[in-house]
Each structure stands twice: as C-alpha cells, then as structure tokens.
Amino acid sequence: MKNSNKLIASVVTLASVMALAACQSTNDNTKVISMKGDTISVSDFYNETKNTEVSQKAMLNLVISRVFEAQYGDKVSKKEVEKAYHKTAEQYGASFSAALAQSSLTPETFKRQIRSSKLVEYAVKEAAKKELTTQEYKKAYESYTPTMAVEMITLDNEETAKSVLEELKAEGADFTAIAKEKTTTPEKKVTYKFDSGATNVPTDVVKAASSLNEGGISDVISVLDPTSYQKKFYIVKVTKKAEKKSDWQEYKKRLKAIIIAEKSKDMNFQNKVIANALDKANVKIKDKAFANILAQYANLGQKTKAASESSTTSESSKAAEENPSESEQTQTSSAEEPTETEAQTQEPAAQ
C-alpha cells in the first residue's frame, strides 16, 4: 500500500475538522487571528468555511461518528482500532507518515476515523444478519462454487501477460513450471485454494476461476489494485474443483458469511443502516448551511418511510373524501386486479 491517495479518499482532513470543531471549544466572538486594524473571530471563520465541500463532508462525518458512538460505542474496542491502525501502517511501510501528513492527519485523528468506520461496519453486519432468510441462502447457493484448487500467475505488465498466455497455449506447455518462472509474487507462490466467496483474491479472478472447468485456463485478467492503484494481470488454471453438494444447508455457515460480506459492501444497504441510526438519534439540522448533508439518507430510514407512508395515506383519504366517485372507481379496479402485495401473497413463500 504505497499510495497515499487511499487515505485522502477515505478519511476527513484534519483541517476540515478543525474548521468545525473550533466552535465547540470557544465562543463565537473569540478572536483566532489579529492583525493591524482587524481581527478574525471563530464566527468569521465558521461562516467563511461552512459552505465549502470539505466542511460539508466533515460535518456529515462528525454527525455519523457521534450517532454511531452513542448507539454502538461499546461494540468496538481500543484494541481493535490499534490493530487496524498498525496494519495500515505496516502496509504503507516507510511512506505511512508522509501519507498521513499529505492528508493533514495525525495518528490520533486517523485512529478516530478508523473507530467511526468500525462502528458503522458493526452496525451494518448486525443489520445484515437480520436479512438471513431461506430465500437469501438459496440465492447465494445458486451462484456458489465450492473450494477450487488453482495455479495462478501474477504479472505487472499486460504485454508480458499476453506473451505468457501464448506460451501456455503451446502444445505440451507446463503451466506449473511457467507459472513459477514468470509470476511476480513473493516467494514465487502459484498454488491457491479458495471458493467463490473468497475476499483475499481479486473478485474478477474468483469469477474467472469459478467459470472454468478442471484443467481450464483463463484469458489475461486485468485488475486495478485498490491499494497501489496499479494494474495487475492474472492468468489462472483450475486444477481441481470440489463437487457441489445438492443441499444448500451443507454450506449454510459459509453462505452466511458470504451474504453478510456482500451486504456489507452494498452501498444502498449501508445507507439504509445509517439512515435508521440517524432516525433513531432524531438528528435535526439547525444551520441551513448544512441542510443537505443528510440528503442521501432521506426516505431510507424506517421512521422516515413510515412517516412518508402515513402522509401518503392521509392525503389519499382526503382526496377520496373530496372525490367520492373517483374513490369508488379505484376500489372497483382494485377488486378486479390484485395488488402486487396480494399477488405475492397468493404464491407460497420459498422454503
């Protein structure tokens, strides 16, 4: 992990947090800058910066952080945060301090961001567990491929990858020998085992391997490395595939992990979880400058949806009273054709 852009994209800059937090530690008239004939107060600074994109994002993150800390604060330990912090530091190596500095972060502000992320992660996983229906299990089973044994070549250059693929296609080519010679992985590792739910192998590589029969060799697979932002190129050969059992319950534990992992990556699902937490916290925006920071979560929370549905029902009832003939026509139409909900109810639920 040698590129500091990942930090920039994933955390709030220290400067933006300071722009907002300054108002908490001092009053509006506190002078933060003085000069000949003029001063700049906290209020001046706040009004100047609050409409900027970075401050809008900072406020959103601050709200989410406070809400999830209040609701799930006891679910994430200091040890977990420290572990994640040191793992990131190890991945960046010697460039970690520079990456933090470039993002205007200190170790402590970065740890706070890690904690906030983990609190949301916990809430999302807990919500995902409630989605574990028989239908979800069966759906996951349909696309599931059990453990595969593969040989994989990892390369840094597309032209080299294409050349290696041609070499592999030659009659009598020894995939294992060529793989060990050409791969750029540490210690020349080429043998792997994983199933279709693996997260330690690039998704496109997993998909390609899952689609192959035993002995099959993939084309060159191009993958953008999310840590280095550099492209990697893969060629895989499936050497063995476990036979898939007919009963999905044989894989229930594994399917559970896959379903939860997929929902945890689903931004729409994440937003619903955040929206529900915001609803529960009864968040109210007091400054119009920040009126739209929660727009992406509007109408996603359970309370918000219920209020919206209640409002719609009330408006429909009022309209029916004002237009009785139209209401009667609607009722007649509804009696002739089942609603979507009724149509679904008429069929037995999947078991």
UniProtKB/Swiss-Prot annotation:
N-palmitoyl cysteine lipid attachment residues: 23
Sequence segments annotated as region (Disordered): 303-351
Signal peptide limits: 1-22
Gene Ontology CC annotations of this record: plasma membrane
Family statement drawn from the similarity comment of this UniProt entry: Belongs to the PrsA family.
Membrane topology: Lipid-anchor
Function according to Swiss-Prot or TrEMBL: Plays a major role in protein secretion by helping the post-translocational extracellular folding of several secreted proteins.
S-S bridge residues: none
HAMAP family: Foldase_PrsA
Catalytic activity: [protein]-peptidylproline (omega=180) = [protein]-peptidylproline (omega=0)
Main location class: membrane
Keywords: Cell membrane, Isomerase, Lipoprotein, Membrane, Palmitate, Rotamase, Signal
Enzyme class: isomerase
Biased composition (Low complexity): 303-317, 326-351
Domain PpiC: 145-240
Lipid-anchored residues (S-diacylglycerol cysteine): 23
Molecular function via GO: peptidyl-prolyl cis-trans isomerase activity
The protein's Enzyme Commission number: 5.2.1.8
GO terms classed as biological process: protein folding
Organism: Streptococcus pyogenes serotype M1
Cited InterPro entries: Foldase_PrsA, PPIase_dom_sf, PPIase_PpiC, PrsA_foldase, Trigger_fact/SurA_dom_sf
Top-level taxonomic group: Bacteria
Protein name: Foldase protein PrsA 1
Cellular compartment(s): Cell membrane
Native organism taxonomy: Bacteria, Bacillati, Bacillota, Bacilli, Lactobacillales
